């Protein structure tokens, strides 16, 4: 990922989410600013790996990110809405896990934080070997997420 990708990621992935869950315009502007700052810091961090996926026309398809926490990494995958329901998610998740683990052999567990309403995402992670053990967490955005875990060999 490079700095030029930051605004593309926001427009293609986060804007709809922000508009859905945060109705106040000042909140939306603050989230946009925080988004830009977060990515600028994290693209050069050793604790984060961010992968951007494009199609053959160089259109933005998806992003996968990994946050390393000792022997566990949090994984997030975001798919451009125009590429959903076309079979991309499973392939992107699998490919990004492979890339991530090549450089992070000390990681023993992967965690995915998924909104309860996001049935499609839950299926994708379950198909990739993640399990849900009734563990939930309220994250910094104030929303409650179900935690799916995959134990690695």
What are these regions (language model features)?
Residues 1-32, 36:
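A short, well-structured alpha-helix characteristic of acyl/acetyltransferase catalytic modules
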Residues 1-6, 11-15, 50-153:
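Acyl-donor (CoA/ACP) binding surface of acyl/acetyltransferases
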